[in-house]
């Protein structure tokens, strides 16, 4: 029997998820289909219910439905609870829905694949939206020494700090801080741009002196060419830049494993996807 999976979003035609999951399934002999479903902005719950009623086993969720998906879940992973959003839904045997957030896990997996252990690293996270919030717990659990969050609206960065310093009786209290963008000083091992500024060819207003010859810069955005943020980072002398394509594949792999109990080969799929991206018409 072939199991049914899907990704819900609006818009959704650009989604790489059907290609990625198809590539994951092929060498593992997993019998499944995976489609992209355009849900009306005001009709996500109805679309999801219809999908599950028609035999759907699990689903990914993208913009703008991650918070709605969170609200529909009967149970949540620790990552999803703290992210306040869900990108992976699983229909359990008892008919309940479990929600996971694999975005941050995908980011960490990609960072480790590129850099090795994150233990003791000093990380600057630019942005304080949903993408930033979803990666904080996985980064802290990966053993980073310090996480500095900086955002145009400082109160949003401070809100994230308040959320995560209250976790586990303050277990992370000394490792997460918020700093105004124009007050950033010191050296960071890794700088992560979680904003979508690169999509418009723009840069977050951070000072150039935060980049040193040892700094690795990571842009969650990706494209056929180097992103605007990563181009800027290289021009300021960054040691290495990485885009978010590996995070996309990584989060998909975590979803696939949750559903199927099988760990797919991400590097093969990442190479295929990179080649596919470069071949697309500009």
From Swiss-Prot:
Catalytic residues, chain numbering: 66 (proton acceptor)
Gene3D superfamilies reported in the protein's UniProt record: Leucine Dehydrogenase, chain A, domain 1 (3.40.50.10860), NAD(P)-binding Rossmann-like Domain (3.40.50.720)
Chain sites annotated for binding shikimate: 15-17, 62, 87, 103, 222
Residues that, per the record, bind NADP(+): 127-131, 151-156, 220, 244
Any one GO molecular function term: shikimate 3-dehydrogenase (NADP+) activity
UniProt keyword annotations, A-Z: Amino-acid biosynthesis, Aromatic amino acid biosynthesis, NADP, Oxidoreductase
Pathway in which the depicted protein is active: Metabolic intermediate biosynthesis; chorismate biosynthesis; chorismate from D-erythrose 4-phosphate and phosphoenolpyruvate: step 4/7
Pfam families per record: SDH_C, Shikimate_DH, Shikimate_dh_N
Recorded GO CC terms: cytosol
Name by which UniProt lists this protein: Shikimate dehydrogenase (NADP(+))
This protein's encoding gene: aroE
């Amino acid at each position: 029997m072939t199991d049914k999976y899907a990704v819900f979003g609006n818009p959704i035609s650009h989604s790489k998820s059907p290609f990625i999951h198809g590539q994951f399934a092929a060498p593992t002999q997993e019998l499944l289909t995976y489609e992209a479903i355009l849900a009306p902005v005001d009709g996500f719950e109805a679309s999801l219910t219809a999908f599950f009623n028609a035999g759907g086993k699990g689903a990914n969720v993208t913009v703008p439905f991650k918070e709605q998906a969170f609200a529909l879940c009967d149970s949540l992973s620790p990552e999803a609870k703290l992210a306040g959003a869900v990108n992976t839904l699983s229909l359990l045997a008892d008919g309940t829905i479990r929600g996971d957030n694999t975005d941050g896990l995908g980011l960490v997996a990609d960072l480790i694949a590129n850099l090795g252990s994150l233990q003791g690293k000093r990380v600057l996270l630019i942005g304080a939206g949903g993408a930033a919030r979803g990666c904080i717990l996985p980064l802290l659990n990966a053993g980073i020494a310090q996480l500095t969050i900086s955002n145009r609206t400082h109160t949003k960065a401070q809100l994230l700090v308040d959320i995560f310093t209250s976790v586990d009786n303050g277990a992370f209290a000394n490792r997460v801080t918020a700093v105004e963008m124009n007050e950033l000083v010191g050296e960071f091992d890794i700088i992560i741009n979680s904003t979508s500024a690169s999509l418009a060819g723009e840069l977050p207003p951070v000072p150039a002196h935060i980049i040193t010859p040892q700094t690795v810069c990571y842009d969650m955005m990706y494209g056929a060419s180097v992103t605007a943020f990563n181009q800027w980072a290289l021009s300021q002398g960054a040691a290495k830049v990485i885009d978010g394509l590996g995070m996309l594949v990584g989060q998909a792999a975590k979803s696939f494993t949750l559903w199927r109990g099988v760990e797919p080969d991400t590097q093969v799929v990442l190479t295929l996807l990179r080649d596919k991206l470069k071949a697309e018409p500009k």
